[in-house]
Amino acid sequence: MAIVKCKPTSPGRRHVVKVVNPELHKGKPFAPLVEKNSKSGGRNNNGRITTRHIGGGHKQAYRIVDFKRNKDGIPAVVERLEYDPNRSANIALVLYKDGERRYILAPKGLKAGDQIQSGVDAAIKAGNTLPMRNIPVGSTVHNVEMKPGKGGQLARSAGTYVQIVARDGSYVTLRLRSGEMRKVESDCRATLGEVGNAEHMLRVLGKAGAARWRGIRPTVRGTAMNPVDHPHGGGEGRNFGKHPVSPWGLQTKGKKTRSNKRTDKFIVRRRTK
C-alpha cells in the first residue's frame, strides 16, 4: 500500500492524493459474481428526487459480496484481492474446497494464498467468521450481523471495526467506532479482524470532476439560493437571520433524527460523535 501525492502539473492535479495497492488484481472481476447496477440519479419510482447530490458518474458493475458467510466447515483459499467501485473496502475472491467461489470483504492483512473458514469450529484468526458467542471478549470484529442469519450490517467500510466488550446471557455488548455501546444477540455472526484499506481516508480527490466521476453532484448552500428554493435564500448579505433549517423547513444542524423506539432498549450508551 502506497500513498502517492501527484505533482502540481495542473490545478486539477495539485492537491490529488492517491492510495495505490500493487496487490490488487488488474484484470476484470469474476463474471459469475457480477450483476448490472443501474443508476437512479437519486430518484424514486415516481421520478422525484429523494436523495440530493446524486447523478452521472462512471458506469459500474455490482460485485455480489457474501455478507452472510454461512458456508460452514468448508475451508477456502484467497485467490486474489480486487478493487470494488461500490464500496470503500477492497474485496477478496475466495475459492472453497468444493469448487465454489465467493467475494468477501478483505480484512486487514489478508493476502492471496491465505486460508479462511466459517462456522463454530473456525480458528480465532483474521478473516474467519463465527457466532459471537464463540469469539473471545475484547476481540475486534467487522461485518457484524444485527439479526442472526440476516448478513453483516455493522463495520463494513474501509478501516472500520467493532469491539466485543462483554457477554451477558444470550447477548453480547459491542463498542462501535462512533462510541455507541449496543447489545446484539450472541448467535449473530461476525468476522474477526478489521476491514482493510484503512488508508482510504487519506485520499484527496483534488478537483470537482473527480467527485463527478463518482456520481456525486455539487452541494449548494441554502444562503446562496433564492427564497423560492430554500428557507435561507434571498436577502441582502449572507446572514439569513433564523435557526438553520433543511430545504423543507425542518430543524437541522444537531437536531436528533432517530425515532426507532423499538430498538432503543438495545443501546447501552449513545454515540459520542
From Swiss-Prot:
Q: Where is this region: Disordered?
A: 28-53, 221-273
What UniProt keywords are attached to this protein's entry? Ribonucleoprotein, Ribosomal protein, RNA-binding, rRNA-binding
Q: Does the keyword Oxidoreductase apply?
A: no
Which residue windows does the record flag with biased composition (Low complexity)?
39-48
Extract the Gene3D superfamilies matched here.
Answer: 2.30.30.30, Nucleic acid-binding proteins, Ribosomal protein L2, domain 3
Q: Which GO terms describe its molecular function?
A: rRNA binding; structural constituent of ribosome; transferase activity
Write one Pfam family the protein is assigned to: Ribosomal_L2_C
Q: What biological-process terms (Gene Ontology) are attached?
A: cytoplasmic translation
Extract the SUPFAM superfamilies matched here. Answer: Nucleic acid-binding proteins, Translation proteins SH3-like domain
Its GO CC terms are:
large ribosomal subunit
SMART domains in the record: Ribosomal_L2 (SM01383), Ribosomal_L2_C (SM01382)
Matching entries from HAMAP family are given as: Ribosomal_uL2_B
The entry assigns this protein to a family as follows: Belongs to the universal ribosomal protein uL2 family.
Q: Which NCBIfam families match?
A: rplB_bact
Q: What is this protein for, i.e. what is its function?
A: One of the primary rRNA binding proteins. Required for association of the 30S and 50S subunits to form the 70S ribosome, for tRNA binding and peptide bond formation. It has been suggested to have peptidyltransferase activity; this is somewhat controversial. Makes several contacts with the 16S rRNA in the 70S ribosome.
Q: How does it assemble?
A: Part of the 50S ribosomal subunit. Forms a bridge to the 30S subunit in the 70S ribosome.
Q: What is this protein called?
A: Large ribosomal subunit protein uL2
Specify the species. Pectobacterium atrosepticum (strain SCRI 1043 / ATCC BAA-672) (Erwinia carotovora subsp. atroseptica)
